[in-house]
Amino acid sequence: MEHSIGRMKDFQGHFGILMRALTYILTMGSDGLKCASTTAVLNANYLQAQLKDDYNLPHDFICKHEFVLGGLKDDCDGQVKTLDVAKRLLDMGFHPPTVYFPLIVHEALMVEPTETEPKQTLDEFVAAMKQIAQEARENKDILLEAPITTVVRRPDETEAAKNLILTFKKGE
């Protein structure tokens, strides 16, 4: 510790994170931050409006930069869960949104598009979500078996949480 530069983390926060935030603010400037914020709100409201016909919308009002869906509207038997939707999104090349949060929304799916996403990407996401809703109505097995295009198929999340394997082992 004799040649240490000293403590990197204190009660004010982690220095590296604070530097990233400061760099972002200085790079964007006042006008850039306003534009990014406006675009984030616009993107979230656009997606919310596009998806509310196929997915439950527990809070149907203008949102900020994110919104929460409450599962599929037409899944009367409750067989298709939010986790199935998220896993199917992996097959379609999308990183799935946060699932099951907030806890007060049944089958919650928190969608938070970034401010840098172009409309084309948002429309592709909408098309994927609508396709998933259609698959839930017509052929639930596609969703219940997803993902099929990833290296790891469908792990048991409960078992994985209970018995963490934190080391990499090359396959047989």
Q: What residue spans do the PLM features occupy?
A:
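Non-catalytic terminal extensions of PLP-dependent enzymes
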Residues: S4, I25-E172
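Long, C-terminal catalytic modules of enzymes
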Residues: M1-F15, R20-T27
